Amino acid sequence: MFFACYCALRTNVKKYRYQDEDGPHDHSLPRLTHEVRGPELVHVSEKNLSQIENVHGYVLQSHISPLKASPAPIIVNTDTLDTIPYVNGTEIEYEFEEITLERGNSGLGFSIAGGTDNPHIGDDPGIFITKIIPGGAAAEDGRLRVNDCILRVNEVDVSEVSHSKAVEALKEAGSIVRLYVRRRRPILETVVEIKLFKGPKGLGFSIAGGVGNQHIPGDNSIYVTKIIDGGAAQKDGRLQVGDRLLMVNNYSLEEVTHEEAVAILKNTSDVVYLKVGKPTTIYMTDPYGPPDITHSYSPPMENHLLSGNNGTLEYKTSLPPISPGRYSPIPKHMLVEDDYTRPPEPVYSTVNKLCDKPASPRHYSPVECDKSFLLSTPYPHYHLGLLPDSDMTSHSQHSTATRQPSVTLQRAISLEGEPRKVVLHKGSTGLGFNIVGGEDGEGIFVSFILAGGPADLSGELQRGDQILSVNGIDLRGASHEQAAAALKGAGQTVTIIAQYQPEDYARFEAKIHDLREQMMNHSMSSGSGSLRTNQKRSLYVRAMFDYDKSKDSGLPSQGLSFKYGDILHVINASDDEWWQARRVILDGDSEEMGVIPSKRRVERKERARLKTVKFNAKPGVIDSKGDIPGLGDDGYGTKTLRGQEDLILSYEPVTRQEINYTRPVIILGPMKDRINDDLISEFPDKFGSCVPHTTRPKRDYEVDGRDYHFVISREQMEKDIQEHKFIEAGQYNDNLYGTSVQSVRFVAERGKHCILDVSGNAIKRLQVAQLYPIAIFIKPKSLEPLMEMNKRLTEEQAKKTYDRAIKLEQEFGEYFTAIVQGDTLEDIYNQCKLVIEEQSGPFIWIPSKEKL
């Protein structure tokens, strides 16, 4: 990548970019501008016009109008504006609105998706609003909403046009833009007050939603998702699936988190007053309409938790023929576009002790009845129980992701105080969990679940479970050795009776922690043990790898987990194997102190691992998770720089420095261009771009110092490059282009983060120039998230993008400020914003010359 500046486009010019990390190559004319000026400009993405995704913009006012929850999009297609579509014979009501926007200094302030060439919702060719940019013209006006469908731009019909045609229409609409949009008519509500009396099965209903866990995209409300047989809600008969909970007793449920709603419901007395909103419009069998309030839930699966003779639980399942679900949040394929990604799957909570049937499926995808079904619980379930003071616990289970249509059923398992049967089949990793306990009759507890192991995949065990028996062998009073022997000799199929005991386990953990602290203090005071303290040494380091204390079996005392990029205050580095440390937080040192592996220990284990990999693995083999085989199995997620086998990344000595400039930002890896787009669009007052240099002659419409710094002498620019005055430079069509240190400094000293589109080599050059950038690497988890976030990528393109990212980490891993991972673009974007906020200064940690 030869150009560092991240800039917007003029309407008649394409942005120059050698290569987008997650899209096709663009070898168009190199033409960068400094900033967007005048109403004729629109901030667009980096791709060719035919590939442009977004129409971003903003106005200069600081007031941001609050965005209201938008109705969910619907799968319809209207041939004309006069035709009202029908879904399954039911009329769907729309409202139409003409919205006039005055284009701000940089555009209209919203993003779009869809078109005849890339439908956003099903087969609907419409152009849909996917994002309202805070502070932009659309947000200030307040009328345009996410999921609005644009039918006309001024006098141009865009109801059935390609994506690029819609973008072109918006770009050429002038400074005053009239949008004619269609949206689904809002659902009217009737507010009802319901008085419930808690019975032996609690309140007897399930909820979903809340701030940060939206059940319906754009809506933070708490919704009823299931009515439990025999519960108070079913006996009363008025509460229905799809009802919106407004108040519980005197507590409002508007704009609360899911956990807050659960806590409010849990802490109620025997008499509970609910205020609920009921939808007054019924959409019959429209799967995209609101809930059908005529039924508590869809026809149930024959899916029961049965009580065994000994009080344990047996699982039994049979499936009825598939029929469309009565209520469905937005299906996955409706949220597929580059700028907007779906929120995380919502958490569901059950307000009763034990569900006799699983929660109703959220939606069905079209499948043949003879296909196999995926039976899993992708969401944590909270069971609020039989007893008023029963504990609320969570349980989650992994579900297998598949790109093919599948049916997901929810399974409710009681984890509170009731013994339950768990059947596991040993795999190559054994049973996949660790145990602790067995002293003084305190019991045997599950302390760790190995990711991907049999226990993890079953979802039936969790940390804090007490193991009561194994294949009929009573372990309630067993020692640790007896329990380990019973599990080891249990054969391939192991039947476990487990009971969730979070309070007992917490007391046990506290006891162990105290014992470890005593051992630590004794070894330090006596000079014996595994920690030698002949010469106490203190320093600050930046972690260059991830460390999980729960996976390190060699710990002599309480460990301290950390992530790549964390700053650690090493209090005692005198021991060859183990150091004592605290994690440094914004306000100083963390209270938590623990043991971490020393630099020597990390490097020794990594070299041993590399020898094993070279012996066992084929050259260049990388597994589906992007890890070299064997990496991190013992908790050490260390890395070795490619081509530098002697340089193993462990810890980097750092020192704290005060800066008087705003740090440049370099984002590397897949999706970096979209993250850069959103940062500049959402925070135009905080992020900017610099003006590049070129030896190309100036064109008539260009302004020196705004579009480029035009260098008269090629010899002079070559001399400046040799003198390291440029962080990155290259040649295109016999002309030199590059970004100078001075251009970056100009932006940084004026209080803006300079967004730089550069290679990893520029990080070190900026550090040498005393402009320490915030360098964030976006590390893909696997191919699947890449293809989910960019639906246009083929598997081959995704593989190339993935491989480029792995090489990028191997080459420049030592220079990254942070590494972020996520399943959605929104998740990655939020993590990047958090890193930038935390690393902005004025006090930052920079590499020091101290030797470890």
Curated annotation (Swiss-Prot):
- Taken from the record, one Pfam family name reads Guanylate_kin
Q: Does the keyword Membrane apply?
A: yes
All copies of domain PDZ, residue ranges: 98-184, 193-279, 421-501
Any one of the GO CC terms: axon initial segment
Name a biological process GO annotation: neurotransmitter receptor localization to postsynaptic specialization membrane
Entry-linked PROSITE patterns: GUANYLATE_KINASE_1, GUANYLATE_KINASE_2, PDZ, SH3
Which InterPro entries does its entry note? DLG1-4_PDZ_assoc, DLG1-like, DLG1_PEST_dom, DLG2_SH3, GK/Ca_channel_bsu, Guanylate_kin-like_dom, Guanylate_kinase_CS, P-loop_NTPase
The positions making up the signal sequence are none
Query: Topology with regard to the membrane?
Result: Lipid-anchor
Q: In which tissues is it expressed?
A: Detected in juxtaparanodal zones in the central nervous system and at nerve terminal plexuses of basket cells in the cerebellum (at protein level). Brain. High levels in cerebellar Purkinje cells. Expressed in pyramidal cells of the Ammons's horn and granular cells of the dentate gyrus in the hippocampus as well as cerebral cortex and striatum. High levels in dorsal horn of spinal cord.
Q: Which domain of life is it from?
A: Eukaryota
Using the record's annotations, give every residue carrying the modification Phosphoserine.
Answer: S28, S65, S307, S328, S360, S365, S406, S414, S528, S530, S553
> Which part of the chain is the SH3 domain?
536-606
Concerning CDD domains, the annotation shows: GMPK, PDZ1_Dlg1-2-4-like, PDZ2_Dlg1-2-4-like, PDZ3_Dlg1-2-4-like, SH3_DLG2
Q: Which GO terms describe its molecular function?
A: ionotropic glutamate receptor binding; kinase binding; PDZ domain binding; protein kinase binding; protein phosphatase binding; protein-containing complex binding; structural constituent of postsynaptic density
Q: Where is this protein found? A: Cell membrane; Postsynaptic density; Synapse; Cell projection, Axon
Lipoprotein found in the keyword field: yes
Query: PTM comment for this protein?
Result: Palmitoylation of isoform 1 and isoform 2 is not required for targeting to postsynaptic density.
Lipid addition sites, S-palmitoyl cysteine = C5, C7
Where does the Guanylate kinase-like domain lie? 662-837
Modified sites of kind Phosphotyrosine: Y58, Y505, Y732, Y737
Task: Please explain the role this protein plays, according to its UniProt record.
Answer: Required for perception of chronic pain through NMDA receptor signaling. Regulates surface expression of NMDA receptors in dorsal horn neurons of the spinal cord. Interacts with the cytoplasmic tail of NMDA receptor subunits as well as inward rectifying potassium channels. Involved in regulation of synaptic stability at cholinergic synapses. Part of the postsynaptic protein scaffold of excitatory synapses.
Query: Subunit structure of this entry?
Result: Interacts through its PDZ domains with NETO1. Interacts with NOS1/nNOS through second PDZ domain. Interacts with KCNJ2/Kir2.1 (via C-terminus) through one of its PDZ domains. Interacts with KCNJ4. Interacts with FRMPD4 (via C-terminus). Interacts with LRFN1. Interacts with LRFN2 and LRFN4. Interacts with FASLG. Interacts with ADAM22. Interacts with DGKI (via PDZ-binding motif).
Family of this protein: Belongs to the MAGUK family.
Q: What is this protein called?
A: Disks large homolog 2
Supply the source organism for this entry.
Rattus norvegicus
